[in-house]
A protein has these predicted regions:
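Extracellular zinc-dependent metalloprotease catalytic-domain scaffold
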Residues: 1-84, 89-157
Length: 157
């Protein structure tokens, strides 16, 4: 499942943020996994973050999964989606936005992500074809608010 998640991210990330060429290899075996760090069935399914940066971008990270939920997630077929989600946090999605100045209105009713590529794609999704700031979570605990797309806009991403 980790290899499938890594393959999915290799399909999503096709170039460097600055437009230069990029050779990206995601090794699922290279991300330490802690299966017991998030206690309680049905609560937080997992958490993840970069543990090192190189040139301001993640170079390695860690993912933790709640052992209380793993069997259920595997049985209902959603574990790979949770792994993809957490692997995205290791890659910087929601975890380095603040450091890079990519969220405006943080702590307000309407925080927004202002990465140019995401704004361009969000404008296409809206049918305006104009770069549009992307709504991010305006509620939730640490690791959720300001670090995920807003569920009222995108559902459970």
């Amino acid at each position: 499942m980790f290899a499938n998640a890594a393959e999915r991210w290799s399909e999503i990330i096709t170039g460097a943020a600055d437009g230069s060429s990029l050779s990206l290899t995601i090794e699922a075996g290279g991300i330490p996994i802690d299966r017991g760090g998030v206690p309680g069935e049905g609560n937080v399914l997992g958490r993840a973050a970069p543990t090192g940066l190189r040139n301001g971008l993640p170079s390695n990270g860690i993912m933790e999964f709640d052992t209380f939920d793993l069997d259920r997630l595997e049985n209902d077929g959603s574990l790979v989606n949770v792994i993809i989600h957490e692997m995205g946090h290791v890659l910087g999605h929601g975890t380095i936005w603040r450091r890079r100045g990519l969220v405006i209105g943080e702590g307000s009713f309407d925080p927004q992500f202002i990465g140019i590529n995401a704004m361009e794609e969000f404008g296409v999704l809206l049918g305006t074809n104009r770069p549009t700031p992307v709504p991010v979570a305006n509620q939730g605990g640490p690791g959720t608010e300001g670090a995920h797309w807003r569920e009222t806009t995108f559902g459970r991403e």
